[in-house]
């Protein structure tokens, strides 16, 4: 026999032998121990409600759990989709349930609905990431950890009676690999029974043709296989929610009162509310929790670990150790870092060269501009000098003319001042002669 065959035989696990017990041992109480531990620890269940504002999400939650949850009134004017989680502690008999209801506020209210699903996907991934980080801790405490992973998404469909909106198809397609989707037709009392039946068939046909995987109630457990198979044929559930009590006959029932009659919430002839409650809470709640952990979370965890460099070993190869994975990832990181550093260095060198060329070009342009301005300045200076010389010549000529004029004016003034003096002398001479003549003549 070859060495490889010997290794294969030695590595094969032996078949366990079945033995009969000679008396009572006591490990048949393990289920009771598990139940007792689970009851002591309590349970958590997280519901995501996706649907347009005013479609009845809060009312249906109140009706499902037969209580009134305090919620804020949603507005139709939300700028974007916002996830609003609220956690409640519920007690039924001796079972404690930590219920978290996450409402997609503002879904479908925007004009541009292309990215309406993005905040929902990011929220679901964020809860997976939180759980993964808790698992990867050296000192982890999953027993006390508040698990916020979404266990079921109730997708509320507007009762148009025609077909699914493109927003519904795109959103459910983005969510089906991350969460258990149960589609429900809200406000089913607004359309007739015949239209409702056609609408259900139309919805399921569109989901199948577009490859949308919704949650199917499990049929592998014999205890619930029959009822789950029947309920799978009723999807999507057409529901009516109400917390008001109306008197019908001699008893009060939760119903909606209309002028034409009463729609009873828990009457299966009126709507599928009872079917939804049975499938969601009383029959398949634990399966929803298990599917979230074993299917959706494991898919997210596997993708994240593969991104970190971890991978499963083949049957014929040696298993990878954590140290080997770390070293391989470290080498990959260092080589990538070195490559990035070289790229950045080369980029820096190229940038420096480009900057030097730009600076030289700027320097040349500035030098040319300086020379041009220098020539312009010299030309302006020459013109100013010419203007100054012309102005000086004009000033000198003006001064010469002014001096000549002033000389002429002084001469004329002198001449005019001499003329009255002669006249006075002539008058005096004339008066003297006349007096002489007057004396001599008797």
Curated annotation (Swiss-Prot):
It holds the Pfam family Septin. GTP binds at residues 51-58, 106, 187-195, 241, 256. Residues 322-410 form a coiled coil. Residues 1-16, 377-391 have a biased composition (Basic and acidic residues). Residues 408-420, 432-442 have a biased composition (Polar residues). Residues 1-23, 377-442 are annotated as: Disordered. Residues 103-106 are annotated as: G3 motif. It is found in: Cytoplasm; Cytoplasm, Cytoskeleton; Synapse; Cell projection, Axon. The modification Phosphoserine is found at residue 10. Septins polymerize into heterooligomeric protein complexes that form filaments, and can associate with cellular membranes, actin filaments and microtubules. GTPase activity is required for filament formation. Interacts with CDK14, SEPTIN4, SEPTIN5 and SEPTIN7. Interacts with VAMP2; the interaction inhibits interaction of VAMP2 with SYP. Interacts with STX1A. This is Septin-8. The gene is SEPTIN8.
């Amino acid at each position: 026999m070859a060495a490889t065959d010997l290794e294969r035989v030695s590595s094969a696990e032996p078949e366990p032998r079945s033995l009969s017990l000679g008396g009572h041992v006591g490990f048949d109480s393990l289920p009771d121990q598990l139940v007792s531990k689970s009851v002591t620890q309590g349970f958590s269940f997280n519901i995501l409600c996706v649907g347009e504002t005013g479609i009845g999400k809060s009312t249906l939650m109140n009706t499902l759990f037969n209580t009134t949850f305090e919620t804020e009134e949603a507005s139709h004017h939300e700028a974007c989709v916002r996830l609003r989680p609220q956690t409640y502690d519920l007690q039924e008999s001796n079972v404690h349930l930590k219920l978290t209801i996450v409402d997609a506020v503002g879904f479908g209210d925007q004009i541009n609905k292309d990215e309406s699903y993005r905040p929902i996907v990011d929220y679901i991934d964020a809860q997976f990431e939180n759980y993964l980080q808790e698992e990867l801790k050296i000192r982890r405490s999953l027993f006390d950890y508040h698990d916020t992973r979404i266990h079921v998404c109730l997708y509320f469909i507007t009762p148009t009676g025609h077909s699914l909106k493109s927003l519904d198809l795109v959103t459910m397609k983005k969510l089906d690999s991350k969460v258990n989707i149960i589609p429900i037709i809200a406000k089913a009392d607004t359309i007739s029974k015949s239209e409702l039946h056609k609408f259900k068939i139309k919805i399921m046909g569109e989901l199948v043709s577009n490859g949308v995987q919704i949650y199917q109630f499990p049929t592998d457990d014999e205890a619930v296989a029959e009822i789950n198979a029947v309920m799978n044929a009723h999807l999507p559930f057409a529901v009516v929610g109400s917390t008001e009590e109306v008197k019908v006959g001699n008893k009060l029932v939760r119903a909606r009162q209309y002028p034409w009659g009463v729609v009873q919430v828990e009457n299966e002839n009126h709507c599928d509310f009872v079917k939804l409650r049975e499938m969601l809470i009383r029959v398949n709640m634990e399966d929803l929790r298990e599917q979230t952990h074993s299917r959706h979370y494991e898919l997210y965890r596997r993708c994240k670990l593969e991104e970190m460099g971890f991978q499963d070993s083949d049957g014929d190869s040696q298993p990878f150790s954590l140290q080997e994975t770390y070293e391989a990832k470290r080498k990959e990181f260092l080589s990538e870092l070195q490559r990035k550093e070289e790229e950045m260095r080369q980029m820096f060198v190229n940038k420096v060269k480009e900057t030097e060329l730009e600076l030289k070009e700027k320097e040349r342009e500035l030098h040319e501009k300086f020379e041009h301005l220098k020539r312009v300045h010299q030309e302006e200076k020459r013109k100013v000098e010419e203007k100054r010389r012309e102005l000086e010549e004009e000033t000198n000529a003006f001064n010469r003319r002014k001096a000549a004029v002033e000389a002429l004016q002084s001469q004329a003034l002198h001449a005019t001042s001499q003329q009255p003096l002669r006249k006075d002398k002539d008058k005096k001479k004339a008066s003297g002669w006349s007096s002489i003549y007057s004396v001599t003549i008797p």
